Amino acid sequence: MQLNKVLKGLMIALPVMAIAACSSNKNASNDGSEGMLGAGTGMDANGGNGNMSSEEQARLQMQQLQQNNIVYFDLDKYDIRSDFAQMLDAHANFLRSNPSYKVTVEGHADERGTPEYNISLGERRANAVKMYLQGKGVSADQISIVSYGKEKPAVLGHDEAAYSKNRRAVLVY
């Protein structure tokens, strides 16, 4: 009889304790730490990355460069336009500062022209970017090129807006 009373008491108390343990107190996390994930990493007041290793800094910088890694070309052209110089200079600075990193320059063309012509044009575009980077001091061993011609369009379409987005070279780390 005594054992039944104890068991009944436990059967009521255990679920109540489990529910109480699972509930959260909304005021408990009011110490200001919520939403501070990553606080301590990132830029310090001097513009440097406070407690990041040089490898982490290089990886972060590379990720930022990958946001701006496309050089566009005019129709049937492969010369680097002046509006892409600053972007390519940033890539060159990164590669010079990080000789262990390598980049592949992918050359592309729009769908007009024969496959052979477009492969050749894509190669000349990729090579133009490679030569620009080498002219800024990047080692030739860090740069490889490939041409896809018209085989990998960035934009599908048969108008000048699509064509202009497909005439490009892409820097891929």
UniProtKB/Swiss-Prot annotation:
It comes from Escherichia coli (strain K12). Residues 60-173 form the OmpA-like domain. InterPro entries: Bact_OuterMem_StrucFunc, OMP_bac, OmpA-like, OMPA-like_CS, OmpA-like_sf, Pal, Pal_lipo_C. This is Peptidoglycan-associated lipoprotein. Residues 30-58 are annotated as: Disordered. Belongs to the Pal lipoprotein family. It is found in: Cell outer membrane. The keyword Signal applies. A lipid is attached at C22 (S-diacylglycerol cysteine). Residues 1-21 form the signal peptide. Pfam families: OmpA.
